[in-house]
């Protein structure tokens, strides 16, 4: 920074200075200049070998307009006062010295004498001295390049040709030091040579591309045209990476502009190497030539020697591969000090400096040094320097700073400097705000930490509370006393507990280890519930909760019997498959109750993350074990019953395949060492009884299905639904609606009507909803009737209701909520009949059990299976056009049929042609008929291998113009040879046929064993007809057919066009 105390450096000594307390301010002021004076002293220390003093020739063309005739103010208002410049007159110097002495007079006599001696040694007017006496503890910074450099220079006013040095990122401003690093060997040698030849001046110009790193200008467009005329004050050997480099400290004096670029010579390197030896021998010689710079040698006796011309820059640098430029000075435009715009902008800059100084200590020191360095006491006298200082301390964009440098109009320069300074203020304020917030947070946390530790210590001293970590360790150890941990688990627990004891509560791993120890000590190691092997008790519980379900109940009783013989019950994996609403989930609870096991249920429907089954790694934030470990923690036994619901709806995503994770869990050979990712220790879940539920087994992966024992639960027939409604659903619904002891009942006919017209599905879920709706409406009517009676009595007695305040109403409501339930009067007797269902439930949902009471030719009822249960499905076939001898045969299929059913229709069509030509050779129906086959309810997709005989019968019925009995249904797949294949879901299809009012059902003979296993109440009212070939089907459904008539049915119609016959469903 610029300083007025450049006449003598502040010396350092080993002696301790005892400054008076009241003069600490002066000591701080002196210390603030120590760094600047050290740079000056070190940079000019090597110049002490010579007493050469150069006359200072200050530019005369930059004077303010109002100072034109003032002989005392001949210096440039912008760049004439450098860091080393002294006051211009002895009178001013003396006044400054006296003032400064007066300020330091009270500190100590010794300091005052030393300062006076230093001031007395200053040189006379227009001379400036770079540094004072040598100090032993201050080493020169420029090493070996300091022996023959002149100590004092007179800065030349005109220096037309210079070494051009490109500067990156930000420009230099007159009056402010800047250290640069040169990596180019030629440039480094040229700088050294300039110092040796006592011409340490260069031109510094800003590169336009801030990412460019070069020391030589090859094109004038690389740099901005306006730069600074700078003096090399000192040089240092440096190292940039693996290459040697040179650091040079520059002091800019004034602005210059490039007029011409002289690019480096290609053959300069060889010439430079040839002159290296010569330059070494002339280190102490004073070369002279007809150069632009002249110097006066000043001997120790004070006599001046004649000026000697110094070698010109081109001749010095002609052997170096460097860039030279011809330049011209860029003077400031004349300005008026009293210009209101300049004064206003200067004042605003000072205000901004004050604001920055309030938030940035670094800026505060720089501003203080700058204010002291001013030659005039008033900053308004030097606005140009103020603008340069504002730009020099701002971290603005290089283009904005270059604009400040190029501005010659002082007002314009001040405004541009104010702009970049305002940006610096915003940056400083933001940084100050961030630092303040961070300090507040750190202070608050530190305060909380100290208070917390003090509170812990106080409580520990009072014996009121143990340390939280010690309390946790004690709790963990206490839990393990009642557990029978396996050896490998005990080892893991001890290791984790030991690590936990050495962790600090503020450590990141503290909570992770604590949670892990909490989980490992809350698992039921060695705890088992006592199982009940009483068959009668198990049968009683199962019958109490569910009607029917003989297969499930028999399997549970078998499990109890085996457990009783062995003395223990091993875990099993069962899968209950059936349509919704048949009681799969509720039967799992009954099994747990019958076996005296704890029950836990979780659903895997739509599950896509394998971590839900096997847990997360402990390295994740918020990690936790999987569902199995959570179940064991909740039930606190090793042998619960875990129900895995909706196992057929497991999803799959990029997070893994949960179905594959279940393979290890649901395998009795592997689940004795089930590994949860969070626990990371083998868990024995072989004693767990796993019960899975599904609507279909088609979507269960085969490897998973193979590990489970599948038990099918078919839909309920009407008789079963009636018993379930009377024994289970109605009592539950009455209790839920407050009618448990009321005389409100639903007749058997109403229940049957409810099943037939409102709850036609395979399960009983809709039946339960309908019954609950009936009792809710009944409860409403009873309560309303009671309230109406009470109101009528009050009116008859003349008692009117009292008005109550909101508070009393609220109290009454609370009292009513906590009062005893309302008892239904004994006189209430409601019997709900079938005719009342419309009143409670609205119009019937299912108006008819089947579409056709009398089926026309071509219409046959088939039976299908869905995950929702069995369904009845009609197959309709008609002739599209009038049958004629010119017709082309075809078959069109509709009804959203799947690929399997489309193939079945093709097989049936081909088989029907073959069968008709074999048994009725004169019937040419299929040779001329354009047919359309349809399965009603086209919005529902249909597929499956069991509609072959139904489609073939529909085609033959149309070809023979003979209807099939309306009460006959059939199911079975057909081959081209007429063989009928085995089908699945016979129970569900039988239930669907019975619900549709069928009397006869045809099924494959290979399913005869399935038919015989059906309960009698399912087969009641149905005649089962097993068939092995289609001939058996044809004989059964067309038993009364006239073969001769059917054989000759169509030829007469085809020959006679006047008697064309059109087939229609009403025929």
Curated annotation (Swiss-Prot):
EC number(s) per entry: 3.4.21.53
Transit pept. (range): 1-36
Chief location bin: mitochondrion
All copies of domain Lon proteolytic, residue ranges: 854-1040
GO molecular function: ATP binding; ATP hydrolysis activity; ATP-dependent peptidase activity; sequence-specific DNA binding; serine-type endopeptidase activity; single-stranded DNA binding
Record-listed ATP binding positions: 578-585
Compositional bias annotation for Acidic residues: 128-139
Catalytic EC class: hydrolase
PANTHER family (UniProt xref): LON PROTEASE, LON PROTEASE HOMOLOG, MITOCHONDRIAL
Main function: ATP-dependent serine protease that mediates the selective degradation of misfolded, unassembled or oxidatively damaged polypeptides as well as certain short-lived regulatory proteins in the mitochondrial matrix. May also have a chaperone function in the assembly of inner membrane protein complexes. Participates in the regulation of mitochondrial gene expression and in the maintenance of the integrity of the mitochondrial genome. Binds to mitochondrial DNA in a site-specific manner.
Family: Belongs to the peptidase S16 family.
Protein name (database record): Lon protease homolog, mitochondrial
Lineage, uppermost ranks: Eukaryota, Fungi, Dikarya, Ascomycota, Taphrinomycotina
């Amino acid at each position: 920074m610029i300083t007025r105390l450049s006449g003598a450096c502040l010396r350092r000594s080993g002696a301790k200075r005892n400054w008076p307390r009241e003069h600490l301010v002066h000591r701080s002021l002196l210390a603030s200049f120590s760094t600047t004076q050290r740079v000056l002293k070190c940079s000019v220390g090597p110049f002490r070998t010579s007493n050469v003093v150069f006359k200072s020739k200050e530019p005369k063309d930059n004077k303010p307009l109002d100072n034109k005739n003032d002989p005392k103010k001949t210096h440039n208002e912008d760049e004439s006062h450098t860091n080393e410049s002294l006051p211009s007159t002895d009178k001013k110097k003396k006044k400054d010295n006296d003032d400064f002495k007066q300020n330091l007079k009270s500190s100590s006599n010794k300091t005052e004498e030393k300062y006076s001696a230093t001031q007395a040694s200053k040189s006379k007017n227009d001379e400036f001295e770079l540094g004072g006496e040598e100090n032993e503890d201050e080493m020169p910074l420029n090493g070996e390049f300091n022996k023959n450099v002149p100590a004092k220079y007179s800065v030349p006013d005109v220096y037309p040709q210079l070494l051009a040095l490109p500067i990156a990122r930000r420009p230099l401003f007159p009056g402010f030091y800047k250290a640069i690093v040169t990596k180019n060997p030629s440039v480094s040698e040229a700088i050294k040579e300039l110092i040796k030849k006592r011409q340490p001046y260069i031109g510094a110009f800003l590169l336009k591309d801030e990412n460019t790193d070069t020391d030589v200008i090859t094109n004038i467009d690389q740099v901005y045209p306006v730069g600074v005329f700078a003096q090399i004050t000192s040089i240092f050997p440096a190292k940039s990476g693996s290459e040697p480099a040179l650091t040079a400290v520059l002091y800019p004096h004034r602005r210059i502009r490039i007029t011409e670029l002289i690019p480096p010579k290609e053959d300069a390197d060889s010439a430079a190497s040839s002159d290296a030896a010569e330059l070494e021998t002339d280190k102490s010689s004073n070369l002279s030539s007809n150069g632009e710079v002249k110097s006066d040698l000043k001997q120790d006796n004070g006599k001046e020697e004649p000026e000697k011309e110094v070698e010109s820059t081109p001749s010095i640098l002609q052997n170096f591969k460097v860039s030279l430029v011809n330049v011209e000075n860029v003077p400031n435009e004349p300005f008026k000090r009293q210009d209101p715009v300049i004064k206003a902008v200067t004042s605003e800059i000072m205000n901004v400096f004050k604001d920055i100084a309030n938030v940035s200590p670094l800026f505060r020191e720089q501003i203080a040094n700058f204010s002291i360095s001013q030659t005039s006491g008033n900053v308004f006298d030097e606005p140009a320097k103020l603008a340069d200082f504002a730009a020099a301390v701002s971290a603005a964009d290089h283009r904005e700073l270059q604009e400040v440098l190029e501005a010659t109009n002082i007002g314009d320069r001040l405004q541009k400097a104010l702009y970049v300074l305002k940006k610096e203020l915003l940056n400083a304020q933001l940084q100050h705000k961030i630092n303040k917030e961070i300090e507040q947070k750190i202070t608050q946390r530190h305060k909380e930490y100290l208070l917390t530790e003090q509170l812990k210590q106080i409580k520990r001293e009072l014996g009121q509370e143990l340390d939280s970590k010690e309390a946790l360790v004690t709790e963990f150890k206490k839990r393990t006393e009642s557990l029978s941990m396996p050896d490998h688990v005990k080892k893991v627990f001890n290791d984790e507990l030991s690590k936990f004891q050495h962790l600090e509560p503020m450590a990141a791993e503290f909570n992770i280890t604590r949670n892990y120890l909490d989980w490992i000590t809350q698992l039921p190691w060695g705890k088992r519930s006592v199982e009940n092997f009483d068959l009668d008790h198990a049968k009683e519980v199962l019958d109490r909760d569910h009607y029917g379900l003989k297969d499930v109940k028999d399997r549970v009783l078998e499990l109890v019997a085996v457990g009783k013989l062995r003395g223990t019950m091993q875990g099993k994996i069962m899968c209950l498959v059936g349509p919704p609403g048949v009681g799969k989930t509720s039967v799992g609870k009954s099994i747990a109750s019958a076996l005296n096991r704890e029950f836990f249920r979780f659903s895997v429907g739509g599950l896509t993350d394998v971590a839900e089954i096997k847990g997360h790694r402990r390295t994740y934030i918020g990690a936790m074990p999987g569902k199995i470990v959570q179940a064991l923690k909740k039930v606190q036994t090793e042998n619960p019953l875990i129900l895995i619901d909706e196992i057929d709806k497991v999803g799959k995503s990029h997070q893994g395949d949960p179905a594959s994770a279940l393979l290890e869990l649901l395998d009795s050979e592997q689940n004795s060492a089930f590994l949860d990712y969070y626990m990371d220790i083998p868990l024995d879940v072989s004693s767990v009884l796993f019960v899975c539920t599904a609507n279909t087994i088609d979507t269960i992966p085969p490897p998973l299905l193979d590990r489970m024992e599948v038990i099918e639960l078919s839909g309920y027939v009407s008789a079963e639904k009636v018993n379930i409604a009377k024994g289970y659903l109605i009592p539950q619904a009455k209790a839920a609606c407050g009618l448990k002891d009321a005389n409100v009942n639903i007749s058997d006919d109403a229940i049957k009507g409810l099943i037939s017209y409102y709850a036609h599905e395979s399960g009983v879920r809709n039946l339960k909803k309908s019954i609950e709706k009936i009792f809710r409406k009944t409860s409403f009517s009873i309560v309303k009737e009671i309230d109406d009676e009470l109101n009528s009595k009050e009116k008859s007695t003349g008692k009117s209701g009292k008005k109550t305040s909101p508070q009393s109403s609220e109290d009454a409501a609370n009292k009513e909520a906590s009062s005893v339930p309302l008892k239904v009067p004994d006189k209430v007797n409601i019997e709900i009949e079938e005719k009342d269902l419309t009143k409670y439930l609205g119009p019937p949902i299912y108006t008819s059990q089947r579409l056709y009471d009398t089926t026309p030719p071509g219409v046959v009822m088939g039976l299908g299976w869905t995950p929702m249960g069995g369904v009845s499905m009609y197959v309709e076939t008609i002739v599209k056009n009038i049958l004629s001898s010119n017709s082309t045969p075809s078959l069109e299929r509709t009804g959203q049929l799947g690929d399997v059913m489309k193939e079945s229709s093709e097989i049936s069509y081909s088989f029907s042609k073959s069968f008709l030509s074999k048994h009725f050779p004169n019937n040419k129906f299929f040779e001329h008929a354009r047919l359309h086959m349809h399965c009603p309810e086209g919005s529902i997709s249909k597929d499956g291998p069991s509609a072959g005989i139904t489609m073939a019968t529909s085609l033959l019925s149309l070809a023979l113009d003979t209807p099939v009995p309306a009460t006959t249904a059939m199911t079975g797949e057909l081959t081209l040879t007429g063989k009928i294949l085995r089908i699945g879901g016979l129970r569900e299809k039988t239930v669907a046929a019975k619900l549709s009012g069928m009397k006869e059902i045809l099924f494959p003979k290979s399913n005869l064993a399935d038919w015989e296993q059906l309960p009698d109440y399912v087969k009641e009212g149905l005649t089962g007809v097993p068939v092995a070939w289609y001939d058996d089907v044809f004989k059964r459904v067309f038993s009364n057919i006239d073969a001769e008539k059917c054989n000759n049915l169509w030829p007469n119609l085809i020959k006679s066009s006047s008697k064309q016959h059109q087939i229609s469903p009403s025929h």
